Amino acid sequence: MPIQILPPILANQIAAGEVVERPASVIKELVENSLDAGANRIDVELEKGGCQLIRVRDNGGGICGTELALALARHATSKVATLDDLEHIASLGFRGEALASISSVSRLTLTSRTAGQHEAWQAYAEGREMAVTVKPAAHPVGTTVEVLDLFFNTPARRRFLRSEKTEFAHIDELLRRLALSRFDVAINLKHNGKLLRQYRPAQTESQQEQRVVQACGAEFMQAALRIDSEHLGLHLYGWLAPQPLTAINEVQYCYVNGRMIRDKLLNHAIRQAYSECTGTSFQPAYILYLELDPHQVDVNVHPSKHEVRFHESRQVHDFIVQVIRQALQTAYSENAPDAVFSGIEDAAPDYPVSPLKNRATGQHQYSAPTGGYSSPSGSQLRSYGQLLTSELPSIPVSREAGSVAAPDNSDWPVLRLIQQRYLLSAQDDTLYLSDLVAIQSLQWLTQCNASFNEGLIAQPLLIPQRLDIARPHEWLAEYGIWLQKLGLRYNTHKNKQIIIQAVPALLRQTDMASTIPAMLSLLERYPVALSHQEWHSFIATWLKLPGLIPHHYSMDSARSLWLWLQQNVADWQNNTQLMRSVDLTNILEVFSRD
C-alpha cells in the first residue's frame, strides 16, 4: 500500500482513540472547555449513560459565529499560539483536537453565542471530508455541545462500552473530581431526565466543606485535617485524613494548578509521608491542591493530560512529604500519651554502654541572629531528600574490651510488632515484650550525652518554620551556647518570633510548633553557663517531654532499635524498664484443664 494522506474523518477517528475512550472522556473534554471559557454554571444532561445523548451547556464567553467552523477543525484553538505558550500553559485544554475527535465518532452539534452577538450560531460536521455547516439558532450567551449516538460509526468501539450503570458511574466520579477542582462553579447532572447531582457554588470555607461532604461523604470531612502551606513558590493546601476510613469509596484527589491529575511522584510523596508517620501501609484519604508557576510544570506529556512533569521534581516531592508529615505529626501528637518512658534519668547510670565515636567532623559555628532569612541553596535542596526520607539515625559505636558482645539473633528471634510500639521476641520457651519507646529514649539519651563537645548535628529544614517563642530575642542570645549545642539554627523575625532554619535529628520529625517552645521552657530552668552536669540533667529531662519520642514504629525501625539494644546495653535481658517476659502460666493452666 503506498504512503498517502489520510482523509480527515479517518485522521480524526484515529485521534479520537486517544481522546475519546468512553462517554466520561467526552464530558471531561467538554466541561474543561466550559471552564476555560469562564463559565460559572455548567449543566450536563445524559441519556443511557451518555451512550445515546450527552449535552453540556454553559454560560461562558461563547464562540463567535465566524469561528464555529474552526472550532470543529483539528488543531484549532484560542488557548496557545506560539511555542512559548506551551512553556506556561494555564488552561485545561490546549491541543485543539477534542471537538474534532468527538465529532468524528458521533453526531455532534455546537451552538454558541457571545455577548457581542445578537443571535447565536449552530455548527455541525458531517461527511467524509467533515465539512462544517453553520446556521443561525436561538441560544443565550454561552455554549451548548450536543453529542448523539457515540461511536455510531465505529461498531468495534461501541461494543467495548459497558452497561449504562457502569458508564454513568464513571461520569459521576468525573464530575465529582471536577466539582472539587472549582468550588466557584455550579455543576448540575441530569440522567434520563432526573436531576441527580447539584453542586452549588461554594465561596466561603464552610460552603467549600459542604461541597466536600457532598462529594466525598461526611466521614471524610469529620476526620480530615485542613492544611495550607507555601514555600519557595510552592503552595499546597486541602484536606487529608490521618486515619483509614471505613467508607468503600476511595477519596484520593490531587490537583495541580486546578488540573485533576494522577501523578506517580505526588502519590509516592503522599504515601511516604503517611508511612513515616504511621509505620503502616494503608489507603490514605486526601484532597490536595498544589499550585506553582506554570513554567515549572509540563502538562503536555500525556494524551489525556492525567500526568504532569515537574521541572524540580525532587523539591516538589520533598515539599509535599514535609507538609503532610508535619500535619500528621501534629494530629498524632494530640492523641499521644503525655508521659514518655519514666525513670530514664534515675536509671541512666545503670546502663553501661559502649563508648561512642564522635559523629561530627568539626565544630558547628553559631551565627548571630539576623532580621531575615534566605532560601536554601541548590546543594541544600539536593540534600533534603536524604534528610526527609531517612530514619532517625542510630548511634555509631566503637567496641572496647569489656563491652557487651552482640548475641546471635537466631537465638533470640523477633516475632512481630504489636500496636506499632512493642516488639515481641522469643528465646527458648519464653516470650518477651520490649518497649520501643523506652529503647528509643535510651538510645537518644546515650547519643546526646556523648555529644557534649561537638553538639547535636543541625539538619536544615526544607521549609523554614516561623514560631512564637514568648521570649525576647535577648533571652535567646543569652542561651546561644546552649542552642548551638542543641543543633538549633534560627533567624530572628518579629518580637518574640523566630524563623527555624535547622534542627537536630531528634526534632526533625516532631511537631516543632510545640516541641521547640517546650524545649525553651525547660531550658529556662537551667543556668546560662553550660557544664557537663547541667547538659546531662537537661537531656534526661528533655527526653521525657511529650511528643519528642515517636510512639509509632515500622518493623524496620523496630529491628534497628532491637539490634542497637543488644549491641550497646549491658545485661539488657534483665532490664525490666526496657523489656519484660510474658507470663504464660495462667494460659497454659487453662489449656491443661481443658
Swiss-Prot record:
Keyword DNA damage: yes
SMART domains reported for this sequence: DNA_mis_repair, MutL_C
GO MF, one example: ATP-dependent DNA damage sensor activity
GO terms under biological process: mismatch repair
PROSITE patterns to which the protein is assigned, alphabetical: DNA_MISMATCH_REPAIR_1 (PS00058)
Keywords: DNA damage, DNA repair
Pfam families: DNA_mis_repair, HATPase_c_3, MutL_C
SUPFAM superfamilies for the chain: ATPase domain of HSP90 chaperone/DNA topoisomerase II/histidine kinase, DNA mismatch repair protein MutL, Ribosomal protein S5 domain 2-like
GO CC entries: mismatch repair complex
InterPro entries reported in the protein's UniProt record: DNA_mismatch_repair_CS, DNA_mismatch_repair_MutL, DNA_mismatch_S5_2-like, HATPase_C_sf, MutL/Mlh/PMS, MutL/Mlh/Pms-like, MutL_C, MutL_C_dimsub
Record family assignment: Belongs to the DNA mismatch repair MutL/HexB family.
Role of this protein: This protein is involved in the repair of mismatches in DNA. It is required for dam-dependent methyl-directed DNA mismatch repair. May act as a 'molecular matchmaker', a protein that promotes the formation of a stable complex between two or more DNA-binding proteins in an ATP-dependent manner without itself being part of a final effector complex.
Protein's name in the database: DNA mismatch repair protein MutL
